[in-house]
Amino acid sequence: MKHSVSSMNTSLSGKVAAITGAASGIGLECARTLLGAGAKVVLIDREGEKLNKLVAELGENAFALQVDLMQADQVDNLLQGILQLTGRLDIFHANAGAYIGGPVAEGDPDVWDRVLHLNINAAFRCVRSVLPHLIAQKSGDIIFTAVIAGVVPVIWEPVYTASKFAVQAFVHTTRRQVAQYGVRVGAVLPGPVVTALLDDWPKAKMDEALANGSLMQPIEVAESVLFMVTRSKNVTVRDIVILPNSVDL
């Protein structure tokens, strides 16, 4: 008996995705990739002027939504803003985040508070804003950018690692709560990616990483997200971990 393998369906025609932290890095590359698959995409970021320039370049299926995720009232109105622009929502990607590394004994707790608020509280609040809508329509995908630090404690970034462990806990408890409604929740967990989040890396560490190939490009993450949200509705990709070959974690 012959078995044929059909080509992977990656069409998002008729779907609407919304992505936080979409003005640069992983978020912007995910926006480009989902647009290329036929989706309409709402790019969410606090940098309104930059967003407007980007959507003009990206075309008529890209929409700008300026939101400061550190402001609770703006996050609480997130769904309303998305629906006003596009009329629907199928995919929500909680991608925005901040990075902090270094020894705990030398850290600034005020900086920690800002990082933890964005990576944890704001991300969870975003999901709270959009989740009832997805439950009501009995379909949808929520994706988190959780990074490898969400499953492997990384010694040089304790606070950041802790924030991503919190994200992973939220992802998989929420996933189990909402699966019954046809809503899928998953996380993409990349290793080091060339983005603005690595601006705090010491120059010597960055130069070494670029030289030895231990950094990935954002497109690697974007293609994984596309894979996750285009699977058959009876399948959930709960985690995708992607590492450069030379990263020993």
UniProtKB/Swiss-Prot annotation:
Keywords: NAD, Oxidoreductase. The active site is at 160 (proton acceptor). CDD domains: SDR_c. The keyword Oxidoreductase applies. It catalyses: ribitol + NAD(+) = D-ribulose + NADH + H(+). Transmembrane segments: none annotated. One of its GO terms (cellular component) is membrane. GO terms for molecular function: ribitol 2-dehydrogenase (NAD+) activity. Its EC number is 1.1.1.56. NAD(+) binds at residues 20-43. The keyword NAD applies. The sequence shown is that of strain A. Homotetramer. PANTHER family: DEHYDROGENASE/REDUCTASE SDR FAMILY MEMBER 7B, DEHYDROGENASE_REDUCTASE SDR FAMILY MEMBER 7B. Belongs to the short-chain dehydrogenases/reductases (SDR) family. This is Ribitol 2-dehydrogenase. It comes from Klebsiella aerogenes. The gene is rbtD.
